[in-house]
C-alpha cells in the first residue's frame, strides 16, 4: 500500500523553470556586427577623403567571425550599397577587389602588417588603374606621387581603426572567457 504513493518532491511547474536566454556571445556578435555595419555605412559619408574604417574592418573581420561570407561580403556590400547613393565609377571592380584581397591576406599575416600591406597594394593597384583608365594627364609615376597624400590618410586611418578594433576584439574575447 505504501509503495503506491507518488513522490511529488521532484515535480516542478513551468514557473519553476528558468527562461531560455539567448546565448550572450551571440548577442555580442550581433551587436558587434551591427556596430561594424553602421560604422562602415556612416564612414562613407565623412568629408575627410580616404580617412575611413572600411579597410580596417575588412582586415579585422576574420578576427571577429569565422563566417567567410560575412568576412568577404560585408565590406564589399557596404561599398556597393553606398555607391548606389554616392554614384558608381569606372574603377569599382579594382576597389572592391582590394577589400577582398585585404581580408584574404589578413588571415595569414599580423593585423598591423596587413594594414601596411593592404594600403601598399591599394596604392599600387588603384592608382595603377587610374593611370591605365587614362584619368588625368599624368604619367604613371606622377599618378603614384599625386596619390601619396590620400593614401597616407588611408594608412593612418587604417592603423587607427585596426588598433581600435583590435582592442574591441580582445575585450569581447576576454569578456566571453570571463563569463563562461
Labelled PLM ranges:
Residues 24-26, 65-70, 105-114, 174-176:
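Membrane-interface helix-boundary motifs at transmembrane edges
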Residues 30-34, 72-73, 93, 112-117, ...:
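Hydrophobic alpha-helical transmembrane segments
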Residues 11-26, 173-180:
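Membrane-interfacial, low-structure loops and terminal tails that flank and connect transmembrane helices
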Residues 108-180:
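Membrane-embedded alpha-helical hairpins and interfacial helices in multi-pass inner-membrane proteins
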Residues 41-52, 76-107:
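Interfacial aromatic-anchored transmembrane helix boundaries in multi-pass membrane proteins
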Residues 12, 23-65, 70, 99-110, 165-170:
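Hydrophobic transmembrane alpha-helices
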Residues 36-37, 71-82, 114-123:
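Central hydrophobic cores of alpha-helical transmembrane segments
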Amino acid at each position: 500500500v505504501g509503495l503506491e504513493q507518488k513522490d511529488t518532491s521532484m515535480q516542478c511547474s513551468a514557473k519553476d523553470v528558468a527562461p531560455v536566454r539567448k546565448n550572450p556571445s551571440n548577442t555580442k556578435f550581433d551587436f558587434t556586427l551591427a556596430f561594424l555595419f553602421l560604422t562602415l555605412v556612416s564612414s562613407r559619408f565623412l568629408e575627410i577623403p580616404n580617412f575611413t574604417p572600411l579597410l580596417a574592418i575588412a582586415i579585422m573581420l576574420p578576427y571577429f567571425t569565422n563566417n567567410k561570407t560575412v568576412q568577404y561580403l560585408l565590406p564589399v556590400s557596404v561599398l556597393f550599397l553606398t555607391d548606389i547613393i554616392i554614384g558608381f565609377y569606372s574603377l569599382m571592380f579594382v576597389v572592391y577587389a582590394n577589400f577582398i584581397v585585404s581580408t584574404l591576406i589578413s588571415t595569414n599575416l599580423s593585423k598591423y602588417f596587413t594594414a601596411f600591406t593592404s594600403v601598399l597594394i591599394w596604392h599600387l593597384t588603384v592608382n595603377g588603374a587610374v593611370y591605365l583608365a587614362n584619368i588625368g594627364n599624368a604619367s604613371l609615376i606622377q599618378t603614384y606621387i599625386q596619390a601619396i597624400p590620400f593614401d597616407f590618410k588611408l594608412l593612418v586611418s587604417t592603423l587607427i581603426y585596426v588598433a581600435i578594433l583590435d582592442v574591441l576584439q580582445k575585450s569581447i574575447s576576454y569578456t566571453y572567457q570571463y563569463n563562461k
